[in-house]
Amino acid sequence: LWVRAEQRPNEARVGLTPAGAKTLKQAGFQVTVEQSTQRAIDLEGYSASGCTIAPENAWPDAPDDAVIFGLKELPKDETPLRHRHIMFGHAFKGQHDGKALLRRFQAGGGTLYDLEYLVDDTGRRLAAFGYWAGYAGAAVSLKCWAAQQHNTLCGAIAAYTDKNALLADLHKDLAKEPANPPRAI
């Protein structure tokens, strides 16, 4: 498994934690993790879990049998894709650039395992938005509400290092508000 660095600006998420990588290593998988200038999780955890560390954006030169794992879109170019890729490809519902991505897989002989279509035996989606996506969405909603109380717009929100950093920032915003919080978000 080759965990690639995300190329999309402001994308700090990663689909595999160091603990998950350690579990895969213990099960006999070889795990390579690319360096990343924007990933929220430090590379040291992956090193400590026994992962091989590769330079950022080295996945095109990964061994043929590597399964490339990422979350969001690949860089837009015409390079044929020869590997198996696990990601949210945004390619099968008429999304922008979907046809071009599929042509790249066809040209290179690679395969796209689109997480949007990963389902269990009953057809239930397995890679749907989880607890933390909802948690972050609620926090951002509260930040927007707090800004609106001062007739301003909520500014850009950068990635937080962890839940406590998010909560500290949110508490700071809410401390400026009257003791009359919203009843619904």
Language-model features, listed with the residues they occupy:
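Glycine/serine-rich phosphate-binding loop and adjoining beta1-alpha1 elements at the start
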Residues: A5, K76-A184
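An N-terminal-biased, well-structured beta-alpha scaffold segment characteristic
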Residues: L1-R104
